[in-house]
Amino acid sequence: MNDFSCPAIAFPSFLNPVIVHLGPIALYWYGLGYVVGILFVWWYAQKLLKKQSLWYANHPPMDKEKIGDFVVWSAISIVVGGRLGQVLVWDPIYYFSHPTAIITIWNGGMSFHGGLIGITIAMIWFARKNNIKIRAMFDIIAIGAPIGIGIVRICNFINQELWGNVTTHPWAVCFPLDPYYLPRHPSQLYEALMEGFLLFVILFILTFAFKALKRPGTVSGIFIIGYAIARSISEIYRAPQEDPEWFSTLFHSTGFTYGMALSLPMLFLGFYLLFQAFKDESTKNGHTQTKN
């Protein structure tokens, strides 16, 4: 704990990364955040699959019971993809020098972009195996995903990781783990709001007011575009992370971060999904097809 006085809002002393110790086992907010997020996506998807009028041809693309079969695969793919993304893309030198640190996911260190790749592979595999339209499968998962992202970002705040740049704004926070104990943007909470709860509201409105699920790929396309934009904005307020050396050499002092660079392919993917959604003639006349 830093002994210096805080010129802004002091980090709440009651917040601890560990919820409770059960003998030698510790329950972490970070791990619980992932569990709650995945369970919310499962619950919300089941609710929407019951509402036939939301879907193209008034026919949900899958039985609501099947989404439960995907929960385990989604959890595994997110954790494995997210951790591999962190290890291979963000800090390979450290993790290869400290291989035991690779499995300590409860301490944080999960790449959203890696998790997205992991669950995308799982969704494509599951959709093909169960004869589900791939873009519809993307929509089913994407529609509730922002809540999970928002919860995990709050857990980042509790873990005192990914804090923001130094600022004089009155809502600045002093993090005890910051060696300089300076007032900083609570960028984790900015991300929780933009990437999480605000994006969820946008998808909610698109789903219920504009019936976006009737064109498979629309919801997932907007989700990916929305996340990429929100992440790029939040990168402005985040304290710089240690980017790969080759990237730092190319973009030194430009303000263009590695997180922004990783979000660029997401923009292209999101617009591609939207293009496919509105090009697909089968969603105009009510007929469905299983190929993408």
From Swiss-Prot:
Gene Ontology terms describing biological process: lipoprotein biosynthetic process
EC number(s) recorded for this UniProt protein: 2.5.1.145
Keyword Transmembrane: yes
Record InterPro entries: Lgt
Main location: membrane
GO molecular function, one term: phosphatidylglycerol-prolipoprotein diacylglyceryl transferase activity
Keyword annotations from UniProtKB, A to Z: Cell inner membrane, Cell membrane, Membrane, Transferase, Transmembrane, Transmembrane helix
Keyword Transferase: yes
Pathway: Protein modification; lipoprotein biosynthesis (diacylglyceryl transfer)
GO cellular component: plasma membrane
Transmembrane segments: 25-45, 70-90, 138-158, 193-213, 217-237, 255-275
Localization of this protein: Cell inner membrane
Binding site for a 1,2-diacyl-sn-glycero-3-phospho-(1'-sn-glycerol): R153
Membrane topology field: Multi-pass membrane protein
UniProt-listed NCBIfam families: lgt (TIGR00544)
Record function comment: Catalyzes the transfer of the diacylglyceryl group from phosphatidylglycerol to the sulfhydryl group of the N-terminal cysteine of a prolipoprotein, the first step in the formation of mature lipoproteins.
Family note: Belongs to the Lgt family.
Protein name: Phosphatidylglycerol--prolipoprotein diacylglyceryl transferase
Native source organism of the sequence: Bartonella henselae (strain ATCC 49882 / DSM 28221 / CCUG 30454 / Houston 1) (Rochalimaea henselae)
